[in-house]
């Protein structure tokens, strides 16, 4: 056997081994990084009040406009792309619940904003869009900056009054359950303040903090599974799961008879 032929023959098993390794490693990686199951109990994600304005638009088959107002976790910080943000994923979820219905979800999240900053752009970012539903995510930046509201929720109520005057349904969303949030002593106080304000004002609240807390404490997911490497923002999986949960909650509340107390089914991943 000539030298060149021998070299080619000797290298053949190595090439085959390399090929096998190249095919096997991605399979192993995929198995190791399998996405967690998206699960949230119906009693945790169920909205307290029906979404009556949204229900009217569904009944008349008119275009539905939803504005997602908030800070970086609405804008999509931590996501791999804008299409992985929760408002983008929510649009997909709602179109699945209401096939043929034209639904527009506008992302009006701005990184770093607190309630006072958002109020300054309410007219342009919310009212001008003539929304049927406003999702208002708030509270996180005040917590991480140790700048708790000192007005007992007056600024939130001012924003709610403005949205209500525009005729839109409202869903508040509280902070995320993430390491850089829960380390702050005022985190729980903020969650309670938002919940108390929502109840006293008769508007809906999506309890994001509790949903994510359940992922950690009940489903035993590591923070790395649903929080970005910065320890603050959500990631693609958690934004998608948030959108799935919120989409189901909105769909149920928009179709709920006012006197109904029927529980929603669990999310099917």
Regions found by a protein language model. Give the residues of each.
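N-terminal secretory targeting modules
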Residues: 1-67, 76-80, 95-101, 129, ...
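Soluble periplasmic/extracytoplasmic beta-strand elements of cell-envelope proteins
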Residues: 65-67, 106, 169
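Short hydrophobic segments within beta-strands
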Residues: 67-70, 173
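Short loop/turn segments at strand-loop or loop-helix junctions that form parts
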Residues: 69-71, 138-139
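Catalytic nucleophile serine of serine hydrolases
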Residues: 72, 109
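Short, solvent-exposed loop/turn elements at domain surfaces
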Residues: 74-78, 115-116
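Alpha-helical cap/lid subdomain in secreted, periplasmic
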Residues: 88-104, 113-269
């Amino acid at each position: 056997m000539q030298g060149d032929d021998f070299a080619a023959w000797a290298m053949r098993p190595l090439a085959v081994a390399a090929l096998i390794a190249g095919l096997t490693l991605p399979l192993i990686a995929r198995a190791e990084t399998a996405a967690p199951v998206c699960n949230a109990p119906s009693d945790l994600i169920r909205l307290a009040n029906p979404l009556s304005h949204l229900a009217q638009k569904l009944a008349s088959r008119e275009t539905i406009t939803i504005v997602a107002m908030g800070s970086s976790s609405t804008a999509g910080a931590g996501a791999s792309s804008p299409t992985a943000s929760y408002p983008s994923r929510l649009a997909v979820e709602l179109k699945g619940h209401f096939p043929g219905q034209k639904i527009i979800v506008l992302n009006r999240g701005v990184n770093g904003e607190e309630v006072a900053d958002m109020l300054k752009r309410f007219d342009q970012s919310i009212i001008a869009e003539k929304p049927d539903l406003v999702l208002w995510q708030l509270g996180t930046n005040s917590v991480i900056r140790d700048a708790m509201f000192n007005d007992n929720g007056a600024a939130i109520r001012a924003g709610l009054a403005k949205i209500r005057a525009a005729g839109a349904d409202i869903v508040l969303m509280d902070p995320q359950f993430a390491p850089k949030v829960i380390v702050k002593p005022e985190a729980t106080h903020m969650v309670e303040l938002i919940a108390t304000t929502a109840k006293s004002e008769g508007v809906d609240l999506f309890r994001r903090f509790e949903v994510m807390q359940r992922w950690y404490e009940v489903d035993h997911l590591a923070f790395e599974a649903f929080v970005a490497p910065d320890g603050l923002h959500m990631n693609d999986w958690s934004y998608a799961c948030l959108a799935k949960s919120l989409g189901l909650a909105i769909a149920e509340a928009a179709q709920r008879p006012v006197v109904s107390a029927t529980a929603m089914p669990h999310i099917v991943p």
